[in-house]
Amino acid sequence: MFRRLLIATVVGILAAFAVAGFRHAMLLLEWLFLNNDSGSLVNAATNLSPWRRLLTPALGGLAAGLLLMGWQKFTQQRPHAPTDYMEALQTDGQFDYAASLVKSLASLLVVTSGSAIGREGAMILLAALAASCFAQCFTPRQEWKLWIACGAAAGMAAAYRAPLAGSLFIAEVLFGTMMLASLGPVIISAVVALLVSNLINHSDALLYSVQLSVTVLARDYALIISTGVLAGLCGPLLLTLMNACHRGFVSLKLAPPWQLALGGLIVGLLSLFTPAVWGNGYSTVQSFLTAPPLLMIIAGIFLCKLFAVLASSGSGAPGGVFTPTLFIGLAIGMLYGRSLGLWFPDGEEITLLLGLTGMATLLAATTHAPIMSTLMICEMTGEYQLLPGLLIACVIASVISRTLHRDSIYRQHTAKHS
């Protein structure tokens, strides 16, 4: 057991450096090509001329597509093993390392060029790859899946600063691929990754800064639960839209570079209306949490961002949809809160409260992982007083969503690529 905990510590350290490496590569490319050193793609888009804002996501998608197609032609074959950590956990615990690194590089290109796709997916993949490489060198074959799981959880902890949620992500989303008794090493890896990541970044700040001064009353619990019901209905709709957009792009029968370029061009067109559509949504989430906008502004940005996410994910842009889902949930919750706020004197606090609830419940509705979703929002924002209400709402959202749409976003993703 001590040996496993020691290896889990090493995996956590490797994962933290993998995530930091991807993050610094992003910052370097943004500085080189976008003349942006703020770390915010929304700021980068705001400072670009309209024609560059239009074309940059398309060019990034084109470059990523050419890279993926070029690699496939160079090797004369499709990847001989999984290039996704979920698939690796559900098979024999092995990766096609070269193809996985090329996929991560393609993700780096689309993410830094403004596509509305999550960067954290590539970060978690790189963390799992580092763990897998170490495991194949120093551990027996029957443990490889465990260390990939530890790497994925550690990558999630480093990316989102949420070690408990990262550990439960493995237990809930990938349930059945590992014994719950193995959660000890997973948690150790996640916590170590967070601590090392904090040292690298010289900061232990929360991912999102929120000033929520409300005391949760019986009325607030009712509003939180009703938001869970709303998210439970919206989650399956979002999954259906993503699936439909993917089928729509596939039906065009374009070569991968042109398909990704088309997705990027749609993002570029939408960014002419608002630069907030660029990137994974982190900057926009933080700005909404700092100062919730008016109803019509939320609605406008929400629609543009939703179409951008659908275009990016539908075109096959390599990356995650975890953070974009957080923004969509925040916007749905805030739209609901703004509508209800017309009838309450503390409308601003209700809007913020239901925005946070929307983040957790839509995440639960799309992942079918209510405990992970609850802890994720609490760890990212530090608002632990919301935990009881969020847990109830997330369970309700997950049950409704699972009833209406059998597959979670991750099972849908795995089925699509199998």
Swiss-Prot record:
Protein name, as recorded: Voltage-gated ClC-type chloride channel ClcB
Membrane topology (UniProt): Multi-pass membrane protein
GO-annotated molecular function: voltage-gated chloride channel activity
Gene3D superfamilies assigned: Clc chloride channel
Subcellular localization, as worded in the UniProt entry: Cell inner membrane
Family to which this protein belongs: Belongs to the chloride channel (TC 2.A.49) family. ClcB subfamily.
HAMAP family per record: CLC_ClcB (MF_01203)
GO cellular component: chloride channel complex; plasma membrane
Main location: membrane
Pfam family, any one: Voltage_CLC
InterPro entries: Cl-channel_core, Cl-channel_volt-gated_ClcB, ClC, ClC-type_chloride_channel
Annotated transmembrane regions: 5-25, 54-74, 98-118, 120-140, 146-166, 178-200, 222-242, 258-278, 291-311, 316-336, 352-372, 380-400
Superkingdom assignment: Bacteria
